[in-house]
């Protein structure tokens, strides 16, 4: 867990989820924390399955809820959003067609997926997504102007062509339409392998985007975190987006 007062310099605040508070042996990634009532819930991937942990503070300590994953099959990269009517949904990645994106309602307890209502959002389809491996992953959804927008990553994360695309829908369960001018972020300036983003609104109400990129043009690891600002604009009668003011945070 890291905290910051300016988004530029971050301070280490200890482990949010300790291995002693989970039964998962390996492959921890993609945690997202949400305040639900008086609890903080972490949705994360572990050993290529979806899990939930909870805590009384956003800093933890988080403890795994139950012993079983949210789905019995392999799945990764979960993210939560609420419909315009306030219903909670989860987007995630199944591995039944390469890596492809699905959406489903969450049950009222926020810990379980309504598996009877799972919907396929999309698989690899656009040419830019076919540079390496069959991968659509890292989805996250936000609402804007009464529409749903989903940002996702495509290509293998080790590829320099790993990048971000946008899709939109009028309904939380889809159908989803990918933007024709994807990717909106791929190889910006000297960065390569950019992807698996999340987003938040800063103190000024600006939509900020967080993503990771390769260590360099010649080395994947360790991947570094970057923060930018999402700018929407219209051109040719269509909506477009770009990422501006990219910074690389530092740690103390």
Give the residues covered by each predicted segment.
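Carbohydrate-active catalytic/glycan-binding domains of CAZyme proteins
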Residues: 1-252
């Amino acid at each position: 867990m890291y905290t910051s007062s300016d988004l530029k310099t971050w301070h280490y605040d200890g482990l949010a989820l300790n291995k002693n508070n989970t039964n998962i042996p390996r492959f921890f990634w993609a945690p997202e924390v949400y305040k639900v009532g008086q609890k903080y819930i972490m949705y994360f991937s572990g050993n290529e399955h979806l899990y939930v942990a909870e805590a009384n503070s956003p800093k933890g300590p988080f403890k795994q809820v139950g012993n079983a994953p949210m789905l019995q099959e392999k799945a990764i990269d979960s993210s939560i959003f609420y419909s315009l009517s306030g219903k909670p949904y989860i987007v995630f990645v199944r591995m039944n067609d390469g890596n492809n994106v699905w959406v489903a309602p969450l049950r009222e307890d926020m810990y379980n997926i309504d598996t009877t209502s799972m919907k396929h959002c999309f698989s690899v389809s656009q040419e830019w997504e076919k540079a390496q491996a069959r991968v659509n992953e890292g989805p996250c959804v936000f609402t804007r102007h009464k529409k749903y927008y989903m940002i996702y990553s495509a290509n293998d994360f080790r590829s320099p062509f790993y990048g971000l695309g946008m899709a939109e829908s009028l309904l939380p369960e889809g159908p989803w339409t990918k933007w024709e001018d994807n990717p909106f972020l791929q190889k910006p300036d000297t960065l390569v392998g950019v992807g698996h983003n999340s987003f938040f609104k800063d103190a000024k109400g600006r939509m900020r985007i967080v993503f990771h990129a390769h260590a360099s043009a010649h080395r994947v690891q360790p991947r570094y975190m970057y923060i930018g600002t999402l700018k929407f604009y219209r051109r040719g009668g269509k909506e477009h987006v770009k990422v501006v003011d990219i910074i690389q945070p530092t740690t103390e």
